[in-house]
A protein has these predicted regions:
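Short, hydrophobic secondary-structure boundary micro-motifs
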Residues: 82-87, 152, 198-203
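GST-like fold's C-terminal all-alpha helical module
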Residues: 102-189
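Generic structural signal for secondary-structure transition and capping sites
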Residues: 80, 107, 148, 196-197
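GST-like domain detector, emphasizing the conserved glutathione-binding G-site
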Residues: 1-124
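Short coil/loop linkers at secondary-structure junctions
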Residues: 25, 82, 175-178, 198
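Conserved residues at the C-terminal ends of beta-strands
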Residues: 60, 162, 203
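Non-transmembrane alpha-helical segments in soluble domains
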Residues: 72, 76, 96-99, 140, ...
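Charged phosphate-binding loop/patch that engages nucleotide di/tri-phosphates or the phosphate backbone
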Residues: 186-200
Length: 205
């Protein structure tokens, strides 16, 4: 298998952590790719993902799996199933719903990054950027109060949440999430004890 990814992508980090935790990391070849709004990458769009998003998992038969959650679920299935994503029952739907929130938080944070760094300064839309940041911030508040998510055995929600917090450090270093959300701070410190989390930290901004 080959994973098209960027070391800076929180979505790709989620897949990398999942692969390590599932014991599959040695079965994946990592291929660095660059996708930037407004910049052409026709080869990636035509050959890998028309949406021009990372990561993408290219299987040995040439087929492609896109979306970080779908890739993580595929890897979980390869590892026997039910390890990071519950196989059935109410727990499965809680995990899928919580992960959808995390995915939306990361989407909003990425849009804030693009608004500031990619969009021409004269077109910057402050209210739109603030609205998207608030979605991520209120999402953090929700998880800060969720003792179950913060304390249960490792799953894809916890992996996704630590990627949210890591991306906040990477791209929004002065946002103050540790001061605002002490339970998330303790959770992040505990998660950083895992090798999979430590070695996947984004490069210095």
């Amino acid at each position: 298998m080959k994973l098209s990814y960027s070391p800076a992508s929180p979505f790709a980090r989620k897949v990398r952590v999942a692969a390590i935790e599932l014991g599959l990391i040695d079965k994946i070849e990592f291929i660095s790719a660059k996708v930037t709004p407004g910049e052409a990458n026709d080869a990636y769009m035509h050959d890998v993902n028309p949406l021009k998003k990372l990561p993408a998992l290219i299987l040995d038969d040439g087929s492609v799996i896109i979306d970080s959650y779908v890739i993580a679920e595929y890897l979980d299935d390869l590892a026997g199933g039910g390890k990071l994503i519950p196989a059935s029952g109410p727990a499965r739907w809680r995990v899928k719903s919580d992960h959808s929130l995390i995915q939306g938080m990361l989407d909003s944070m990425l849009l804030c990054r693009y608004e500031k760094m990619v969009r021409p300064k004269e077109l910057f839309w402050q209210a739109w950027s603030d609205d998207h940041w608030n979605r991520a911030w209120v999402g953090m508040a929700k998880f800060n109060k969720d003792a179950d998510v913060l304390s249960r055995d490792l799953d894809i929600v916890q992996i996704g949440l630590v990627c949210v917090l890591g991306y906040a450090d990477f791209r929004f270093g002065d946002c103050g999430w540790r001061e605002a959300y002490p339970n998330l701070k303790a959770f992040h410190e505990r998660m950083m004890q895992r090798e999979s989390i430590r070695i996947s930290v984004p490069p210095t901004a």
